[in-house]
Amino acid sequence: MSAATIRYFAGAAEAAGTDEEVLEGTTVGEVLAAAQQAHGDRLSEVLERCSVLHAGRYVDDDTTVITPGATIDVLPPFAGG
């Protein structure tokens, strides 16, 4: 199992109660599940609308294997223009 730094932005940071933490998992899905378990339903609801980046690249598959020491960014939709 690897550890990854997960960074939350905007509404995701508010729902998690932090803007960064280190969580363990083998895949992006496992890390996000650990985050949901740690922070509850509010974060789970926000994650449904978020984009997720692993090592700076968009992830659309929760089975993506994380690289040791990787960063996972959780980005809610942004409004404005």
Pin down the residues of each PLM region.
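Ubiquitin-like/PB1-type beta-grasp interaction modules and other compact soluble beta-rich domains
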Residues: M1-G80
